[in-house]
C-alpha cells in the first residue's frame, strides 16, 4: 500500500518527537538514491578511510545531483513535511544535508546526545535551553535506503530536560560513547547494543 498521511503522523511527531513516513519514496527514486549513494560512499572512504560515517554536504561533491533534487521536490514528501511542521518548512537542501554511511570494517555507535547541546563544542547552553521547544529548531529527516534499525530515541524527551534516571545512568554531559578500544567485531556489537538499550525509556526505530 502506498503512503497515506494521517493525523497520527502529526500527533506522533509532536508527542513522541518522531514520526515514520512508511513507503513514502517510490521504488524508482530509492534505486536512483542508492546508486548515487554508492558513489558517495566511495568518495567518502577515499577521503576519510573505511570507518568514515558520512559525506556532507552532498552538493559540494562530484555526484549526480538529480536524485537529490527529485527527493527534495517529491510532492508527497513536501506535503507531509508541511503538514507535520508548517508550509514554511522545507527539506533537501543539498548545501546542508549528507549521506550517513555504515562503517566498513568495525561496528560503531554514536554517543547518546541531544542535537547541538551535546555535539556542538562551545554552544551557548542558555540559548539552547531557550530554543528547546522552538518548532524551527532540531528537526531532521532520515531517509533510509535499506532496512535500517540503527536509530535509537527516547520518545517524548524533546519536550523536557533530562530526567533524574537518565542523569543517574549517564551522569556526564556530554554523554561519552562506549569504550570500543581493542574489542573484536562481536564484542563491539554487544557493547554498542548494551550501551544504546540502557538509556532509560529508549526504543529502537525500524525504518
Give the role of each language-model region:
Residues 98-106, 116-117, 143-150, 157-160:
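Short acidic/polar capping segments at secondary-structure boundaries
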Residues 18, 71, 89-91, 108, ...:
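Sequence-level detector for tyrosine residue identity
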Residues 18-20, 203:
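Residue-level preference for the first positions of well-ordered beta-strands
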Residues 1-15, 22-127:
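Non-heme Fe(II)-dependent double-stranded beta-helix
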Residues 15-16, 200:
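Structured helix-beta-strand junction loops
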